[in-house]
Regions:
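Conserved P-loop NTPase-based nucleic-acid remodeling module centered on helicase motor cores
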Residues: 2-79
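A short helix->loop->beta-strand "cap" motif at the edges of active sites that frequently abuts
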Residues: 15, 169-173
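Glycine-rich, phosphate-binding/catalytic loops in enzymes
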Residues: 34-35, 165-169
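Short, hydrophobic beta-strand segments that form beta-sheet elements in well-ordered domains
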Residues: 1, 149-151
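Short amphipathic alpha-helical segments and helix-helix/interface helices
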Residues: 8, 164-165
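Short, flexible loop motifs at catalytic/binding sites
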Residues: 155
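Accessory N-terminal region flanking or inserted into the helicase ATPase core
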Residues: 59-149, 158-163, 173
Length: 174
């Protein structure tokens, strides 16, 4: 064991919750990899709907990292709607007023894609990154924390701030 490996292992032992908000939600919800949408799920959804869906998450070592899609403008609009207006059933309509859509049929296509994705996840009991936060907020089970450190807070979405607020309210860190 090298000093670097030992240090990382010791850090994980000493600070088990030193992680991203997504990883914290993943851990606290006790999620398993098979419950998360993966490449095969997105490929199946594409085949079923004839529309382009891409995996926005990169999995590794139990940590999920959000990646930009860039391959699916319509899916990016859906993701933006959930990030900006997580608890608003009118989220897509609000985002439609804020972003320039590429063509006249885009609204209908995006609304159908959102419905298809929602139904697919429901039918297969799968989650995406945005679902971690929704479930974590519903469950309200943050770990007991002495300190709460938010790195790059300026980049957090409204949804992520809701998670931070819930953690602060329940855990009451210094």
């Amino acid at each position: 064991v090298t000093n670097e490996e030992w240090s990382e292992a010791e850090l994980k032992k000493m600070f088990p919750y030193f992680c991203t908000l997504h990883s914290l939600a993943y851990k606290r919800l006790r999620l398993e990899a098979h419950e998360i949408m993966d490449e095969l799920d997105y490929m199946e959804l594409c085949d079923m709907t004839g529309r382009k869906f891409v995996n926005k998450m990169k999995k590794g070592n139990g940590i999920d990292i959000s990646m930009p899609t860039a391959q699916s403008h319509y899916q990016d609009v859906i993701n933006l709607a959930y990030a900006k207006y997580p608890n608003d059933d009118d989220r897509l309509q609000k985002v439609f007023r804020e972003v320039k859509l590429p063509d006249y049929g885009a609204r209908n296509t995006i609304m159908q894609m959102d419905k298809d994705l929602t139904n697919f996840k429901r039918d297969r009991h799968k989650l995406e990154y945005v679902d971690y936060f929704n479930s974590f907020l519903e469950m309200k089970n943050p770990p007991p924390l002495k300190y709460l450190f938010i790195d790059e807070a300026q980049d957090l979405s409204a949804h992520q701030w809701m998670v931070v607020d819930m953690i602060q309210y329940i855990s009451k860190p210094i």
